[in-house]
């Protein structure tokens, strides 16, 4: 009997150690990062006709801006009136404060472009530079020791919207994010406008989508694709995340393409060819939640891209940021959580200065996926098209709009949502 109990005790002890080891391994392999996009901070929020304020901001150092904004009611107020507007200082600060609460020590932070406010012009270059420096300062104050991986968007230029950045912008942009953007990555950015960053066994490749946007014909674009191909074909490269601002594929809002068609197909073919290495692609630009699925020539889903929502609510969307949990060994994303600020639930006639971004949308649960993968996103699209109950459409709608109740028919009409899904399919040729 003694031997029996001793054997049982020994078995339970071994089982307990195995469970403990598994839990420890899970904790070690699971890491989390922040993904942010389309901040569109407006330093002249509510005061674009105020020439005195403009001159004050232009003449002040960017690290003096905080005091200026803190004395401005327009900059500090958070309320329902911010819907369809760029971000004021109140929203930007609230976003960063909530990021720090939700994930105090991220493995890294990805920012997928568009820091500068809409309708900025080349004449605003001084404010643009200080705007970038100010945003970078705030991120570095909140996350002093965290690597920050920023991409450039179409608004991020000293020229007009969508115009390729010049060398001065590359230098200013890289310097603004140093030292959180490591020097080796910053040097690449200064030289060519795109770069890579390695952490553990993951390589992040940050493209400059200004080279690819529809109607552009920049001679530097082929060199960027060559750089991408060279890195992906390297035997030492095992796990890759690709980051950009403007996604490939169709723009359902105006019927055009986001990129030049040839560039789109070149990118699709590269992603399909190296799909075993590319564990995630990230884009933004639309201000809404979405995805793309890459299919090989046999029509099998082999890779996916996530399009992440924005801090700016200029498209009528809720301000949002994401926490992504990933396996540090395989570098595949396990879970995504969008934290958003429900602006419509706030008063219109008065504002708050502190807001909790508590409402969440998550993957894979939000779209009833079994896991976050190309195959599951593809199945979701097939199931939605066949669903007569509209339940999956409602799930997609909530996911796409980040919980915003938008009246605009271009976003809530069923036909248009099916167009979005059609645009989400990218096939090898």
Locate predicted features.
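Non-catalytic terminal accessory segments
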Residues: 27-31, 104, 331-429
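Extended active-site neighborhood of metal-dependent phosphoesterases/phosphodiesterases
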Residues: 125-230, 262, 301-305
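Short, solvent-exposed beta-strand-terminating loops
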Residues: 32-63
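Bacterial Sec-dependent N-terminal signal peptides
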Residues: 1-27
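Active-site-proximal beta-strand elements of phosphoester/diester hydrolases
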Residues: 31-43, 81, 201-212, 243, ...
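Core catalytic region of metal-dependent phosphoesterases/phosphodiesterases
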Residues: 64-70, 78-165
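His/acidic metal-ligating clusters that form di-metal
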Residues: 101-105, 203-205, 214-303, 320
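Active-site glycine-centered loops adjacent to acidic/histidine catalytic or metal-binding residues
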Residues: 38, 113-114, 153, 245, ...
């Amino acid at each position: 009997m003694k031997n029996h109990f001793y054997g049982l005790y020994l078995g339970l002890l071994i089982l307990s150690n195995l469970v403990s080891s598994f839990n420890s391994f899970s904790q070690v392999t699971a890491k989390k990062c922040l993904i942010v996009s389309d901040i569109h901070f407006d330093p002249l929020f509510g005061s674009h006709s105020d020439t005195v304020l403009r001159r004050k901001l232009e003449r002040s150092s960017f690290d003096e801006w905080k005091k200026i904004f803190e004395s401005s009611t327009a900059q500090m107020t958070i309320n329902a009136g911010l819907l369809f507007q760029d971000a004021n200082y109140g929203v930007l600060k609230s976003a960063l404060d909530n990021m720090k609460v939700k994930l105090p020590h991220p493995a890294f932070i990805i920012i997928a472009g568009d820091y500068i406010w809409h309708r900025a012009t080349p004449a605003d270059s001084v404010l643009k530079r200080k705007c970038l420096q100010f945003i970078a300062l705030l991120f570095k104050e909140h996350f002093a020791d965290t690597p920050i991986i920023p991409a450039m968007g179409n608004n991020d230029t000293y020229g007009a919207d969508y115009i390729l950045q010049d060398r001065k912008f590359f230098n200013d942009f890289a310097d603004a994010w140093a030292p959180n953007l490591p020097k080796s990555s910053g040097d690449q950015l200064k030289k060519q406008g795109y770069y890579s960053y390695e952490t553990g066994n993951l390589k992040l490749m940050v493209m400059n989508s200004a080279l690819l946007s529809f109607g552009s014909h920049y001679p530097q674009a082929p060199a960027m694709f060559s750089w991408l191909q060279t890195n992906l074909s390297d035997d030492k490269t095992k796990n890759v995340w690709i980051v950009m601002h403007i996604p490939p594929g169709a723009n359902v809002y105006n019927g055009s393409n986001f990129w030049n068609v040839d560039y789109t197909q070149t990118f699709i073919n590269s992603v399909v060819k190296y799909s075993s290495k590319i564990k995630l692609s990230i884009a933004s630009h639309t201000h809404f939640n979405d995805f793309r699925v890459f299919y090989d020539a046999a029509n099998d889903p082999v890779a996916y891209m996530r399009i992440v929502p924005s801090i700016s609510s200029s498209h009528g969307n809720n301000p949002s940021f994401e926490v992504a949990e990933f396996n540090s060994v395989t570098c595949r994303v396990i879970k995504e959580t969008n934290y958003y600020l429900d602006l419509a639930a706030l008063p219109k006639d008065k504002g708050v200065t502190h807001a909790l971004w508590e409402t969440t949308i998550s993957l894979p649960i939000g779209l009833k996926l079994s896991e976050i993968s190309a195959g599951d996103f593809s199945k979701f699209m097939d199931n939605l098209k066949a669903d007569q109950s509209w339940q999956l459409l409602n799930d997609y709608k909530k996911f796409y709009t980040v919980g915003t109740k938008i009246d605009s028919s271009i976003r809530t009409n069923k036909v248009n949502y099916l167009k979005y899904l059609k645009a989400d399919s990218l096939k090898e040729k």
